[in-house]
Amino acid sequence: MKQFRGTTILSVRRNGKVVIGGDGQVSMGSTIMKANARKVRRLYNGKVIAGFAGGTADAFTLFERFESKLEKHSGNLTRAAVELAKDWRTDRILRRLEALLTVADSKASLIITGLGDVIEPEQSLMAIGSGGSFAQAAAKALLENTKLSARKIVEKALTIAADICIYTNLNFTIEELDSES
């Protein structure tokens, strides 16, 4: 069976805001199966935003697990991410899930992988998915050379990625939180 693939998720932190945005395209092989999937959402009573790249069903399973870890650890993003990564790597069923998560709260931004990695970006941005490198390059240029807001940078960088990556469309979901940095 062909795998569902491709997406672009981008997170930017700037001027007291953290924004995660993603496109809405779900592709299977060379066919667009859905154009308006919601790959970015709010968790933990709206205090955390998260985006996923990879299998949709896998991502929803991981969102549920991550939210339960947030509840268990009183909203501590880093602790919840580490605990999810440990489970994801060691659980026989979870280990088969194919997705990447980007998560952010007011203090931190992280990428969580199925290999057990929890990665905090060195700069104010992170990107995943098939169009992630295009969006990241565009966002980096915009961060360094403009005074645009985090939201505008996400919008413009996702648009650039959609112009380049065939697995990324222009139907964006964007969530924003106030940030301490």
Curated annotation (Swiss-Prot):
EC number: 3.4.25.2
Swiss-Prot/TrEMBL GO biological process terms: proteolysis involved in protein catabolic process
Ligand binding (Na(+)): A162, C165, T168
Keywords: Allosteric enzyme, Cytoplasm, Hydrolase, Metal-binding, Protease, Sodium, Threonine protease
Active site: T7
Catalytic activity: ATP-dependent cleavage of peptide bonds with broad specificity
Subcellular location: Cytoplasm
GO molecular function, one term: threonine-type endopeptidase activity
GO cellular component: HslUV protease complex; proteasome core complex
Function in brief: Protease subunit of a proteasome-like degradation complex believed to be a general protein degrading machinery.
Record NCBIfam families: ATP_dep_HslV (TIGR03692), PRK05456.1 (NF003964)
Subunit structure: A double ring-shaped homohexamer of HslV is capped on each side by a ring-shaped HslU homohexamer. The assembly of the HslU/HslV complex is dependent on binding of ATP.
Protein family per UniProt: Belongs to the peptidase T1B family. HslV subfamily.
Stated name of the protein: ATP-dependent protease subunit HslV
Recorded name of the encoding gene: hslV
